[in-house]
Curated annotation (Swiss-Prot):
A GO molecular-function descriptor: UDP-N-acetylmuramoyl-L-alanyl-D-glutamyl-meso-2,6-diaminopimelyl-D-alanyl-D-alanine:undecaprenyl-phosphate transferase activity
Subcellular localization(s) per the UniProt record: Cell membrane
CDD domains linked: GT_MraY (cd06852)
Catalytic activity, reaction form: UDP-N-acetyl-alpha-D-muramoyl-L-alanyl-gamma-D-glutamyl-meso-2,6-diaminopimeloyl-D-alanyl-D-alanine + di-trans,octa-cis-undecaprenyl phosphate = di-trans,octa-cis-undecaprenyl diphospho-N-acetyl-alpha-D-muramoyl-L-alanyl-D-glutamyl-meso-2,6-diaminopimeloyl-D-alanyl-D-alanine + UMP
Protein name: Phospho-N-acetylmuramoyl-pentapeptide-transferase
GO terms classed as biological process: cell division; cell wall organization; peptidoglycan biosynthetic process; regulation of cell shape
Origin: domain of life: Bacteria
Pathway connected to this protein: Cell wall biogenesis; peptidoglycan biosynthesis
Organism of derivation: Corynebacterium aurimucosum (strain ATCC 700975 / DSM 44827 / CIP 107346 / CN-1) (Corynebacterium nigricans)
Pfam families found in the cross-reference section: Glycos_transf_4 (PF00953), MraY_sig1 (PF10555)
Similarity comment text for this entry: Belongs to the glycosyltransferase 4 family. MraY subfamily.
Keyword NAD among UniProt keywords: no
Amino acid sequence: MTQIIIAGAVSFLVAIFTTPVLIRYFSDTGRGQEIREDGPKSHLRKRGTPTMGGLAILAGILVAYVVAGLYGLLTGHEAFTASGLLVLGLTLGLGAVGFADDFIKLFRHRNLGLNKTAKLISQLVLALLFGFLVLRFPNDAGLTPGSTKLSFIRDLKTFDLAVGGTVIGTIVFLIFMYILIAAWSNAVNLTDGLDGLAAGVTAIVMGSYSLMTFWQFRYSCATNFAAGCYQVRDPLDLAVLAAAGLGGCLGFLWWNAAPAKIFMGDTGSLALGGLVAGISVTSRTELLMIIIGALFVIETVSVVIQIVVFHSTGKRFFRMAPIHHHFENGGWAETAVVVRFWLLAAMAAMAGVAIFYGDWLTASGIGVGA
């Protein structure tokens, strides 16, 4: 537990003190966010706001993971595990893609940033590499960081992507990894449209995963082989990463809350999407993440609906997509949209954690007959 607290605290401190350094640098050099002319008119005042604040979040996560890991090694706990390093690598890799996108926008003055093909190929390479490696590195019990079985709270034995054999199964799994990682990274990116929205929602999701992965560690089959135990390779290291993500988002949110003094940019949003995807895969909760991260799902679905309806009928289903802009254009203040969406995200996360805990009660036999 101390290791997890250290990760959250260190990440928060690094992010909260690094962010103003970025604000000063980008303000002094006159490099700031461009604002869409077709967006909400109230957003035009944000033109020139410093961006790439995701660097502070990533710095917090990286430093916290190393510090907490060193503490873990000194105290005899697991640290720098295959699961943790793979998730961290995915997070930093997608952060690098986002950084390239932001860099081109700010320093090369190309408003569209990294072209779609380059971004697509970069995400594809990272997803395939993560998917390939996550099925390697078995521990003494034969557990790998990921599994070809679809997982809700535990692996679903009836839904194995490798049912067609090793070769076909691996191909199907890699395709699934790409869809999953691209979906979550782009979902967080779409949510990052209002001051504090993406950082706040991600903090809620990471807080939930800090609790759940710690619970998986406490009742791991590796140390406590009993009814209801969890077959997860490195739950404590995942809890450390989730806590680091929570701390980093909160430290950044201090400066990103309305009126934002800095935006996270694609550097932050793509990286945090990778963190969400990676932890869901390695904690064996890919499907549960749909509930816990429901706000991200809603934002993404609203864009899909808008595109499909517009191409089918020539009319818009929402005033503007993603859906947070729909409410803005309907007269809601930006802060009202953000706080209400935080509340929705918190309710979804609580529902997910409740389902997770309810499953443990049932699987362990404690909830039987209650």
